[in-house]
């Protein structure tokens, strides 16, 4: 479990995180939702130790992450940043191999090679194994970066807007893969997501943020309600349920804001 206690972050006179306290349950898929500027990415990057905070504490399974060596942390927590970009011309297999760096330090063992193959197979990327990243579609490239993160074989995966700029098919493929990581392998997945319907239908746990503060958090059924989403986003929501899941409808025929 990841526990956040009174976390704050400031940039000069601007507060981007204000005394945030919440938890991300182990073995579950948690989605960070909220309007732009809510502090979602700042919180995620703080957990990833890619951003220093000014106040508060983050604990990983009861231990302050500041007390964990960076090398050890990289074997527990993997991070996929928004729109990752490599300037090197790499094949899919070469990219995925970067996920083994916390273990191999550049010298791949048989165990590393197996982890690479397992990650590629998990995401059905075998036909693209020797393809170069610049030859792939945006969705295929994002799947390759996700495979790199999976190859790191950490207990926790942090993903910043992994569905950004993807078509519906690739977005569904990624969310299904993340769901499988939780259900079949017991991984803990935390992601920032803007599409409220993906969050509502693939998550176990939701953390909603607004204006740098925690708005609410809990199981999907407690957070994804008409009243809470309307207040969170300032739009008129209608939520319907079917055998296929929840549909959060915020469209108005007139095109006017609520």
Question: Where does each model-flagged region fall?
Answer:
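The feature captures the beta-strand-to-loop junction immediately N-terminal to the Walker
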Residues: 33-35
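Helix-to-loop junction immediately C-terminal to a conserved catalytic motif
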Residues: 48
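Conserved ABC transporter NBD signature motif
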Residues: 56-64, 73
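Conserved ABC ATPase "signature" region
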Residues: 97, 110-128, 153, 158
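Conserved ABC ATPase signature
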Residues: 132-136, 140
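ABC ATPase nucleotide-binding domains
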Residues: 233-258
